[in-house]
């Protein structure tokens, strides 16, 4: 997959519109498709609705890359990005967009190939559902004990909802 100047312009324009929140989108058959960021805190993370991804793939073809921006950051993957890239096993395009101390705007767009990445057990970046307390336990059991615990979707704050299903009980029995 090649990032054309036209595609980069579309991604840059979308990142500017979404700023200071993270933009996100998909590249399918060389075309950029902006997506809504449905993350609980879009200024710090991005999330593309899974059903939206499936629908886009049905109508437009195979996803070639996942795109998102790092407002006031660089175009290098964060620790959470590295974990996710390995799980999705497709390219990621990251946009660093912001302002320099002199007030000038900068934009850097880079494509990254997926690699297998394991976060350190200590000092890892926290993000619920990706690198949270449960994923720490999963990683420890997998690396040190060769026991593979199941993964399951968990929304942030589920434990505060009175009538929420007991995730751990339901997923371990």
Model segments located where?
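Eukaryote-biased recognition of intrinsically disordered, low-complexity regulatory segments
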Residues: 113-121
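Second-shell loop/turn segments in exported
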Residues: 121-127
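Residue-level recognition of short, structured coil/turn motifs
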Residues: 20, 145-146
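Active-site nucleophilic cysteine motif
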Residues: 128-144
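...with weaker cross-activation on analogous glycine-rich loops/strands in unrelated enzymes
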Residues: 156-173
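Short acidic alpha-helical/loop segments enriched in Asp/Glu that coordinate divalent cations
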Residues: 146-158
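Residues at alpha-helix termini
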Residues: 88, 144-145
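Conserved beta-strand-loop surface patch within small alpha/beta domains used
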Residues: 1-65, 72-114
């Amino acid at each position: 997959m090649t990032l054309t100047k036209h595609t980069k312009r579309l991604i840059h324009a979308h990142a500017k519109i979404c700023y200071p929140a993270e933009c996100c989108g998909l590249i399918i058959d060389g075309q950029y498709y902006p997506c809504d960021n449905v993350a609980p805190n879009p200024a710090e993370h991005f999330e593309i609705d899974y059903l939206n991804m499936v629908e886009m793939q049905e109508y437009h073809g195979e996803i070639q890359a996942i795109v998102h921006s790092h407002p006031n950051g660089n175009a290098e993957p964060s620790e959470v990005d590295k974990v996710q890239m390995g799980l999705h096993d497709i390219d990621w395009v990251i946009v660093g967009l912001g302002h320099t101390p002199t007030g000038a705007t900068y934009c850097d767009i880079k494509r990254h190939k997926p690699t297998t990445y394991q976060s350190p057990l200590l000092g890892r970046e926290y993000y619920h559902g990706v690198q949270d307390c449960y994923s720490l336990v999963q990683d420890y059991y997998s690396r040190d004990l060769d026991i593979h615990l199941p993964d399951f979707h968990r929304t942030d704050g589920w434990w505060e909802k009175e009538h929420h299903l007991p995730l751990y009980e339901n997923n371990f029995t």
